[in-house]
Amino acid sequence: METNESTEGSRSRSRSLDIQPSSEGLGPTSEPFPSSDDSPRSALAAATAAAAAAASAAAATAAFTTAKAAALSTKTPAPCSEFMEPSSDPSLLGEPCAGPGFTHNIAHGSLGFEPVYVSCIAQDTCTTTDHSSNPGPVPGSSSGPVLGSSSGAGHGSGSGSGPGCGSVPGSGSGPGPGSGPGSGPGHGSGSHPGPASGPGPDTGPDSELSPCIPPGFRNLVADRVPNYTSWSQHCPWEPQKQPPWEFLQVLEPGARGLWKPPDIKGKLMVCYETLPRGQCLLYNWEEERATNHLDQVPSMQDGSESFFFRHGHRGLLTMQLKSPMPSSTTQKDSYQPPGNVYWPLRGKREAMLEMLLQHQICKEVQAEQEPTRKLFEVESVTHHDYRMELAQAGTPAPTKPHDYRQEQPETFWIQRAPQLPGVSNIRTLDTPFRKNCSFSTPVPLSLGKLLPYEPENYPYQLGEISSLPCPGGRLGGGGGRMTPF
């Protein structure tokens, strides 16, 4: 009967997990899960009472440990199967997340995966630190009664101050619990790690933290709370501190060389030199050099450079910085609102008709006031200035009666022949019209002849008759002389 109760108690205790605050052992251990069956609850209560009695008396503890070891030896894989598959107890799924069952609820529901509970973590012998010389509790070995699960005598799972994480077969150095109802406590450590089946139930009131529990499952409540102190180094949203600003001292635009920061940084250095505007053209800065005196900030009380030149360079744009802004700008002058917003009262046709009638009336009034001008001959400026009357066209009036049969016709050239230079002296009308050779005739030939322009007493002198006689005849009744050949 005691064996069956121990078996049922070990089953119910295998469903519970220990909730320890940390690996230092601060705080008491938690109570196991309450089971839904009445018989396991009574067995668990009996086991708890037996564990309390074992803490006060070493002999009772040894007997209780022997009974539990005998019960576990008959049914060893039960805790492993209970922990490897999800719980089918409806009372465990329906309980609120409070008290000792909080770890079990988290393991099966809240974390979103099926946990595999490990009772002993397999460690690599090469990377694991040697804990044999450490006086503290070493995983896998301790100095106390343990719950062994072996099929024969001489096979213990280790030793500890409480129930160890024993389902790992190993070779003990002392007599271990056998399959019989009674056996002594063995002192030894398992030398062969086996498959883990989960942490064993700890019923001692002052028991230490089980070394076989992984660090992630020791305190799930504390592990689920984010540690902002450790995350602050890796959080991308936390603003990082920027290095302090340093004042850059830059020389003239044409100067070369790298800038070296000053050694003294305690006092604020105000740069009064001209700040360059670029480094592209080092030797073509005539315009910048010409305006260097305008770029200098007088003192720090005037503010920064951008604040000092917020209205532009002093003297370039305006000489009166405090003068108000003009109300009229180029934009406003270009887009003035229309003066007369109303439509005109008359159209273009009416205005054009009125203009046409006005021109017609003006022409009529001028025609009435001014008389009509007569047509006049074309008169040049010279004729108008000298007022010379033109000769009338037509034949002159005859002075004497003429005989057109006997008289030589009087023409325009005969009348104007004496006026022409180089013409022979015409004394009478019968004198032939020839070239005057009086001045070129030799002297012997001209002896006895009349001199040029000498008057002759011929009856038919020029001016007395108006025509010449017919050739071969005489003129008049008196004798006359013939024209010499």
UniProtKB/Swiss-Prot annotation:
Residues 327-340 are annotated as: Mn 1. Residues 1-42, 75-98, 127-215 are annotated as: Disordered. Residues 379-393 are annotated as: Mn 2. Coiled coil: none annotated. Microtubule inner protein (MIP) part of the dynein-decorated doublet microtubules (DMTs) in cilia axoneme, which is required for motile cilia beating. Plays a role in spermatogenesis by enhancing the binding of CREM isoform tau to its coactivator FHL5 and increasing the FHL5-regulated transcriptional activation of CREM isoform tau. Involved in the acrosome reaction and in binding of sperm to the zona pellucida. Plays a role in regulation of the cell cycle by controlling progression through the G2/M phase, possibly by delaying the activation of CDK1 which is required for entry into mitosis. Belongs to the SPAG8 family. This is Sperm-associated antigen 8. It comes from Homo sapiens.
